[in-house]
Amino acid sequence: MVSKLEILQRFYQIYLEQESDYFIYQEKFYYICRINNFTNDYTYYMNSLNLAGFTIVNNCFNRPVTMDYILYTYQIEDYHLDTFIRQSMIPIQSTVEIIKIKESWCKILDEAKCKIGNYASRISHFEHFVVLSYYYQGLGECAISILNQIKSKEIPAGIEHFYMNDSYEVLCCPSNFVVASRIKDLATGYKNNLITINELEEYISYTNLSTDELIYLYARLLFPGQFMKLAINDDCNDSQVKKRLLSIYQNIDNEKLILIQAYEMLSRYTYIPKIAWL
């Protein structure tokens, strides 16, 4: 398998000492990634935001694609997070099935429970992980239970981000887009403290979300995707992972507060079951 370093050397005459998706070469910013389902729509999407975004660099044969990879160059532009969130809430001609969301969440919880069980005897001294595992398993089960309140089989989809952060390189990254529920970015933005509870309510009013979308929004806020990803994919005995787990543990009170605030706000619009222990 040819590495990215070899591709850059052979097809772009770019010579790096270390492989990285983002890099600077001769004072220019670059990004290299595989082609994906959003590649052909990327330019149209960025134009709709009045941004240049990342621009394709043709290889030495004047072709945009090299062994399923594309090299981009970019310059960081002025942007507003608000523009991306509003764009993400525009429905496209696609929907997301509630049953598939439920199946996905159940699978994640099962995988995490299995992984946590395998670690339990070896990391029993690391109490933060044990406390977090019980807490987030409970939150995840509550989130799935709340999905059962949704009457529709499907909800509108939008162009969302895999990862959400208030950064040009994250928001405009050509490989960071996914078709998902049109409130994915909204939920992640609030959960990551990128927007306030008042701004969350403003977006809800602006978009006129359906009752089922409001219920799903709360369920999505509850579901502990970040912790479960750590539990499933990372070595929980690793020192860096332990630091991240400790950070999550220390932030639990703040996380509870934003969930309580979201519940109080959303329950003014529709009925949502209250979690007694939250």
PLM features per residue range, with description:
Residues 63-79, 111-122, 189, 223-247:
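A glycine-centered beta->alpha junction motif in the catalytic cores
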Residues 22-24, 54, 144-186:
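Active-site acidic catalytic loop and adjacent metal/ATP-binding pocket
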Residues 228-278:
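ATP/Mg2+ or Mg2+-diphosphate-binding catalytic cores
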Residues 25-97:
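ATP-binding pocket architecture of kinase catalytic cores
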Residues 168-214:
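Active-site Asp-x-Gly
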Residues 2-29, 54, 61:
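ATP-binding glycine-rich phosphate-binding loop
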Residues 216-223:
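Central hydrophobic cores of alpha-helical transmembrane segments
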Residues 10, 14-23, 97-160, 198, ...:
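ATP-dependent phospho-/nucleotidyl transfer catalytic cores
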